[in-house]
């Protein structure tokens, strides 16, 4: 998938976030990125925290293993997930 790659022993994910959705879930690929709908609003970092929590739970890693590299204030985000490969991330999130 174009939205996931291996880099330095971790998976790097390109994500498009839609805050204030009815529920938190991954909805598929959009514009070369994984689109994730978040129930949290984009206020005071709530959406970023919800994204980290969702990814950690979906990928079976600790929240500390999920690091936001780019996009702290935007909808387009780049996230590094330690302890998992890009192929494993795609399998977990695309299902």
UniProtKB/Swiss-Prot annotation:
Family matches, as Gene3D superfamilies: YggU-like
Domain of life: Bacteria
Protein name: UPF0235 protein A2cp1_1215
Any one cellular-component term (Gene Ontology): cytoplasm
Family designation: Belongs to the UPF0235 family.
UniProt xrefs under InterPro entries: DUF167, YggU-like_sf
Transmembrane segments: none
Native species: Anaeromyxobacter dehalogenans (strain 2CP-1 / ATCC BAA-258)
Alphabetical list of PANTHER family matching this protein: UPF0235 PROTEIN C15ORF40
Lineage, top ranks: Bacteria, Pseudomonadati, Myxococcota, Myxococcia, Myxococcales
